[in-house]
């Protein structure tokens, strides 16, 4: 009565309320649903499915109610089973027993694609939901599961294989994965070998690698802790293990990055190998390496798979800037490690820089102009240009600008650099210079109509766009477009807000303008928090979410389709800032993500593929061909 009374109270309080009841001891759960017509009780057994499964398995063991006998392809042993049970667990058996096939009416069926061990494993799993695996029965089980389309067993086999990969069995596991099209396992084996390749070289398993997997490994940017010479020697060892393998020599050598070896190594260790002198493809690979090394200034526009850095680590990189407290100019080159959430140092510049220009061609970083000493008027502008090679973590000097310049914009466009406007001790500049890496020289192109400094720029569709800036002490909102093919400037729709010392970048087909500053009143500077993007198709501007905090004279980079605005100066707070803000174009949202190690104004940023500093620890040295004696 007490139970019924409790139910009535619930119904009176809320006639639509559900009440859940449970009994772990009985393996039963229930809920009550009330309505105007009365109370309906729903019960669920938590043990029913396992009891039914156990019951079917007992019937199978005792040979009761079995209506078909399965015979493996490799013997005469028979396995009495229930058609309904097999069809419920396998699309293969469902089609066999219900699809009008001749086996539908047979009492004994021979399965030619399955052996005794595999068939027993599959039947045991279907009736018990349990599976025991070891390397002795794995392949038989895999073969049966693939043939009979038992997906859970295939998944268990994948887990078993992945969990047991080692140096001793990775080649065999890879073979099994390839045979049965186990994509996840195959990918895991590749990653394991890439991570442990130096250790694998010291085992007898290395020479057992199939050609396809070895070629993949040698072509991968994820292969670490090996020099190209070591990879070449490993490839030669694999080729010589069996004479028929020599037919793969040219195909395998295409994956070795000969241009990154020193000339001495090419002469002493590569050209002395017979097939490198006799095979036409291999000879051409050596010629390619020689030509590449003979033209150091041209290398950024000669990049190929064999000249690229062997690294998969692309990061946000910052360079230079002026320190907040001491007003000392930095020469630090840093990358941000997203996994470790920390900044790590790369090779510093030879000289400090701020308010400089940076651009990337072929994953080479160019640093152009700027200032080495703190001066707000640009009187200490320089004309020197340096290039950073992340493959060797080294800098080299290239041809200087025709004019010293700072507060300018630098773009990389169609394999050239364009330095636009700026200022120096002589005043504001309207001139534009173009750097040709093939000639290692700067030449003038069409200048702007008016001198500009503190402007920003970006490239899209083979054109360079320049926005805002300062002309004759007046902030601008104009947008200009430069076509390098016609050497002409054209005017586009102006921004909605005047701004200078802002930043600009391209994401997809949109040209974003962010931050900066302008006059508040007649003489006081004010942060510009508003942002907007330009559509080249519509020739119009659209506002987007405002920045969280003002930043001028910053570094800007696009990384994984997000915009990062780094450091700079806040006019509202009258100080350099260390903040890094990220804008998500898809969500139209700003977030503060992390900080610089110190507050830096006039800093610059980009994305670059590098060797993270820890990859250099304990790794073979990477000697630049340019610095080899």
From Swiss-Prot:
Name of the protein in its database record: Kelch-like protein 13
InterPro entries: BACK (IPR011705), BTB-kelch_protein (IPR017096), BTB/POZ_dom (IPR000210), Kelch-typ_b-propeller (IPR015915), Kelch_1 (IPR006652), SKP1/BTB/POZ_sf (IPR011333)
GO CC annotations on file: Cul3-RING ubiquitin ligase complex
GO MF assignments: cullin family protein binding
Lineage, top ranks: Eukaryota, Metazoa, Chordata, Craniata, Vertebrata
Pathway assigned in UniProt: Protein modification; protein ubiquitination
The protein's assembly and partners: Component of the BCR(KLHL9-KLHL13) E3 ubiquitin ligase complex, at least composed of CUL3, KLHL9, KLHL13 and RBX1. Interacts with AURKB.
BACK domain residues: 170-271
GO biological process terms on file: cell division; protein ubiquitination; regulation of cytokinesis
Protein keywords: Cell cycle, Cell division, Kelch repeat, Mitosis, Repeat, Ubl conjugation pathway
Encoding gene per record: KLHL13
Native source species: Gallus gallus (Chicken)
